[in-house]
Swiss-Prot record:
The gene is ileS. Binds 1 zinc ion per subunit. L-isoleucyl-5'-AMP binds at residue 564. Monomer. GO terms for molecular function: aminoacyl-tRNA deacylase activity; ATP binding; isoleucine-tRNA ligase activity; tRNA binding; zinc ion binding. NCBIfam families: ileS. Pfam families: Anticodon_1, tRNA-synt_1, zf-FPG_IleRS. It comes from Shewanella loihica (strain ATCC BAA-1088 / PV-4). This is Isoleucine--tRNA ligase. A motif ('KMSKS' region) lies at residues 605-609.
Amino acid sequence: MSDYKSTLNLPETEFPMRGNLAQREPEMLKSWTEKKLYQKIRESRTGAKPFILHDGPPYANGSIHIGHSVNKILKDIIIKSKTLSGFDAPYIPGWDCHGLPIELKVEQKVGKPGQKVSAAEFRQKCREYAAAQVDGQREDFIRLGVLGDWQNPYLTMNFDTEANIVRSLAKVIDNGHLHKGVKPVHWCTDCGSALAEAEVEYEDKTSPAIDVAFVAVDQAAVLAKFGLEQSDAEVATVIWTTTPWTLPANRGLSMAGDIDYDLVEFTKDGSKRAIIVAQELVESCIERYGAELHSVLGTVKGQALELLRFKHPFYDFDVPVIIGDHVTVDSGTGVVHTAPGHGQDDFVIGQKYGLEVANPVGDNGVYKPDTEFFAGQHVFKANDNVVALLEEKGALLNHVAYRHSYPHCWRHKTPIIFRATPQWFISMDQKGLRTQSLSEIEKTQWIPDWGQSRIEKMVENRPDWCISRQRTWGVPITLFVHRDTEELHPDSVALMERVAHRIEQEGIQAWWDLDAAELLGEEADQYRKVTDTLDVWYDSGSTFSSVVAARPEYNGHPVDLYLEGSDQHRGWFMSSLMISTAMNGKAPYKQVLTHGFTVDGQGRKMSKSIGNVIAPLQVTNKLGADILRLWVAATDYSGEMTVSDEILKRSADAYRRIRNTARFLLANLNGFDPVNDTVAIEDMVALDRWVVRRAAALQAEILEAYEQYNFHLVTQKLMQFCSVELGSFYLDIIKDRQYTAKRDSLARRSCQSALFLIAEAMVRWIAPILSFTADEVWQSLPGEREEFVFTQTWFEGLVSVTLDSDLSDDYWANLITVRDEVNKAIEQARREQRVGGSLEAEVTIYADEALTESLALLGDELRFVLLTSNTQIAPLANAGDDAVETELAGLKLLVDKTEAAKCDRCWHHREDVGQVEAHPLLCTRCVTNIEGDGEVRQFA
């Protein structure tokens, strides 16, 4: 016999080397849908302990971006890993469907409501637009391999959800948290509506910074406070502001009670002035005003000046000095211009002193007709006119352009204003909501843990929540208010339930179609319907009640986990906490996990103008969703998540390592029947027992990492195992035994059994992350099995057997180190062209006594571990000058080219080649494997 190829156990599998993910994944998705994969997962977990991850709804507008992909993939990894852990983990995706962005898109198509179309028609167009956006985003999310109830998602515009949002508000009202008030709120003049804190972004803006003098009404009274009887100069106090347009609404001058204020006399352009400013800011003020000389006439605490009155710089009334904790001496003058209608601090201190809440500005940002000097002017355009009038009146001491951070509308990207308007608020303090929320924050696990202090500070400092909006497309605030007293109808909660019942049937339009008499009867004339809509953050913030409590899949279980981007501490996490605590006295979640934003390779935000946007569909169409999923899993999401073409290329390289490992396992399971061929772990060859033990230990680490949501550790450990323990060591060593041993021998079946156990475990390890590839591997594994890996639990066949005391974990770890040193020495000999490959090498190991004793345990099988044809061990003292030093103490190596003949079948060079006459080209080991009982392997 001259061709021995047929006697070898060559690897064979239909599992392809190339993933071709971009082409293969859509076919798999189609199969998953046709075979009702998600429903089968649900059925497989009937009666299991629930794990509820509640989906924070993305906004139903536009294509998904890379941040959406990160979020959905992280959620999918968790859902799948929890399912593998035996939990019943449903995933119901949701969408946020009301609000301004959709209104603006619809306005562009059909015009504003009440002009070309009725409000009812406009709402219907908004509903249709949102539905189309949901359809588009749904397909994109499905393409990422995210499993969920995609055909039955929750939409905040679903009639039943809209009704439940109304019911949620009724509970908040019933618990005493709602109040109506005229308060300054963030107001976008382009939207014509109030904005929530979460709808405000801060951008740099150039504003006029001005110092304005308010002249004393009773100069003698002011001087007396400083112990003076008279002064040649006119006495004034000075404010510094970057919002000149708010001066028409000025009603007070705030000072700090415990700060020293100086009365400073100075000369400028030949005339004297006397001004009151904070002592710490005198030098900077005098420099700013370009004064020639100055002197301090006296000093008092701010408290001493309380209720002294000063003339408004251009109106015919005067305003008082008031004392406030918000005043600092960081900049300006230490005296704060106070307009209660245009600022939160101003409003609070104004309430304390009973100041008028003046609001001369209309919804559109234009001064009202009765505003002297500025009627009909837009506030930002009026700034220059205010400055000019101040100069004309002699009240302007300084005017410069000032660059600073300023609030902008998140949608229009335009500067916003604070403006006092009648609005509905959820009070933070009238029923202890702030205190209770802070208590609930402490009971919640925040991942990363800095999330706790972040949201605590926000809750501690946040104002009452303005929940009303003056918009068309939103859930209505379904209240009846008395026309004379402005009081809520005494049966408001019961009435809201009746309205909710109608909305359940007809949607939110039912409120606007409702004739008050239908519910109020003869009282109808005494009440008016509220026409405001709810802040969309209320919509999404109440979904723990409107969706989770209502969907049968959740069976009334509380939510375990909320997972969103780090901006949601002030958004969805906050609104959900406020509403849940107001309704039920507790947080809606047990754990809150946040991930960072995606940035490019240079740490910059994704921007179309920069041209660094990476669209998820471009990645899936080019590389495949599994590559994107691997990048997400491998990135530490606790900080910024860097992504670029180069980084994705590295993810593709890592993927190939995992895929090639899986393919090697599958190819070498050719002909293996798990039922009949499996070797018990205790009967395996020592090396196989060790690798099974390593896999069992790794599985424990991987499961712990999944449990802690440390997916980057999962990928690190998996890559380490594939590259080092398997790729560079175990799989390399077993090739000889796998290919050349007798087909049904214990030596080969032991190896295959270990490979099978590893493959069964690994396919589950990768399933939450590389979902498409895991399904592909699953279909290629030998033995009867259920249809999908996603209905399985973690593999229990990996038993952490106790190794022989002589062949411990430390023994094998040390052996890997020795092998690495041998490989280096052989590679050096190959570069020097002394050997062609490792099987041409004879290696002499010069070792100290301890290492000699250790290596000798393997006997002749040491050569299989080192991949050499012959290996001999000699005392370290015998090493000659030609022996190579290694990095391992007590080890030197000598590599020589073997003189022995090469076996045609196993390619080992052995002295016994040709000893069997019938097989002159084979070594005796190969003859035994062909014609005899097969070689016996004990160790490797």
